[in-house]
Amino acid sequence: MELELITIEKLAEILKNQYEESLKNEQVVNIHLFGIKYGEIIKKYSYSASKIIELSGLNKSYKTELSKGIRLSKFVKLKNEYSD
């Protein structure tokens, strides 16, 4: 399956929007979900979790949470209501 090219800037924008639109107590889990959803693209294009977090404007400590989601993408498939 061919993975669509999404720029690192676009990924950062998507992450920022997803984070800001989340309920306060679900923001971290939404970072994990983002990593799961876009993990294959992030890995294929060798994008850095640190750079995505930096470009998104989120606290740099969230890099760890994004990295967890990216690693989980190898094992987890999102339910339809969480994917495009």
Tell what function each PLM region has.
Residues 1-2, 82-84:
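Intrinsically disordered, low-complexity and often Lys/Arg-enriched segments
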Residues 1-9:
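General nucleic-acid-binding
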Residues 11-37:
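Short, Lys/Arg-enriched anionic-surface-contact patches
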Residues 48-55:
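Short alpha-helical "recognition helix" segments of helix-turn-helix
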